[in-house]
Each structure stands twice: as structure tokens, then as C-alpha cells.
Design a protein with these regions (language model features):
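Conserved post-catalytic alpha-helical subdomain immediately downstream of the catalytic base
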Residues: 137-171
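Glycine-rich anion/phosphate-binding loops
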Residues: 1-3, 148
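Short, small-residue-enriched loops and turns at beta-alpha junctions
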Residues: 24-28, 107, 124
């Protein structure tokens, strides 16, 4: 963890987008505090987590930095969160970067609009590595957004990326 600030400096210097996956931040105060420190650098290009993780971050930024242990899930797993679309939108506006909250329905917000992507599936949480793979796919697509930026918003572009991933998972 001590090297993340150096990594951020190098990423900014070389214009490399930073995709943050706050794995298990809803499960404990230490992980959440590290994620909040990363967000406060204003260097995050995209925040992607399950709905419980995104809610924990939103709550911590808005309710005295406390973790809602009722959403602890088991390990890095999360649960479907009520009002996740609203939380995703508000968090994207607050931290000024796109936010993705995954679950049975995925939500994407660029702080202007929220997109619902219905291709999430509960079985994906039972397969180890699907969240990590999604992070890699999002990073690859995110880094290729420039040619599309005049045709669609980043939120719409990321919603298409999630749809692509979800449909590929159905095969």
C-alpha cells in the first residue's frame, strides 16, 4: 500500500488511466480507509465495485467515515443494494469520475446519467476471478475511449462495455 502514491505519480506522468476496484472495502475499516485515501488523490479514472462496496464508499464519504457492517457480505462478495442506481450517480458526481456498481443488475454513472445494464448474473459471483476479469476488460476498453468520445459519453461507453462482458458471459 505504501507505494500507491508513487504509482499514481507515474500513471499521471504517462497518462495511464487508473481503474480502482475496491475489493472487500465493505468488509473492514482498514480496506475502506485505503480506498478513501486513493479516491482523495483525485487520480482515479474509473471506480468499479460490487454494489455493497460502492455503498460503503458512498456512506463513508457522506456519513462520518463509518462502515455499514450490515452489508459485509462474505469475503469480497456483496449483495444487491436497494437504491444502487442513485448511490452510483451521487458517488460519480461527488468524486468526479465514472462509477460502476455491479450485481444482478449493473449500474454505470458518469455523474450526468445512470445506465442500467441487465446482463449481470448471480452465478458470476460463484466463479472466482470474474470480477477481476471485468476490471481488466473495463481497463482495456476505458483506455480505448478516445476515438469514441465525440459519439457517446463515457457512461454510455462503459454501459456498452458491461453489456459486452455480460453477453460474453452468457455464452
Amino acid at each position: 500500500v505504501s507505494y500507491y502514491k508513487d504509482a499514481i505519480v507515474l500513471a499521471k506522468k504517462h497518462e495511464v488511466p487508473i481503474v480502482l476496484d475496491p475489493v472487500g472495502c465493505h468488509a473492514g475499516a482498514y480496506r475502506l480507509s485505503v480506498v478513501l485515501d486513493l479516491i482523495k488523490t483525485d487520480a482515479i479514472s474509473l471506480l468499479r465495485g460490487n454494489q455493497s462496496e460502492i455503498k460503503a464508499i458512498y456512506d463513508a464519504l457522506n456519513i462520518n467515515h463509518k462502515v455499514d457492517s450490515s452489508l459485509s457480505g462474505k469475503g469480497v462478495d456483496g449483495e444487491q443494494v436497494e437504491d444502487s442506481a442513485i448511490i452510483t450517480y451521487r458517488l460519480a458526481r461527488q468524486i468526479n469520475c465514472p462509477v460502476i456498481a455491479t450485481g444482478e443488475e449493473d449500474y454505470v454513472s458518469d455523474g450526468i446519467r445512470v445506465f442500467t445494464v441487465p446482463y449481470g448474473h448471480s452465478i458470476m459471483t460463484a466463479v472466482t476471478g470474474t470480477g477481476c476479469l471485468l476490471g481488466a476488460v473495463l481497463a482495456a476498453f476505458f483506455s480505448s475511449y478516445c476515438p469514441f468520445m465525440y459519439n457517446m459519453s463515457i457512461g454510455e461507453f462503459l454501459a456498452y462495455t458491461l453489456a459486452y462482458y455480460g453477453l460474453a458471459g452468457e455464452s
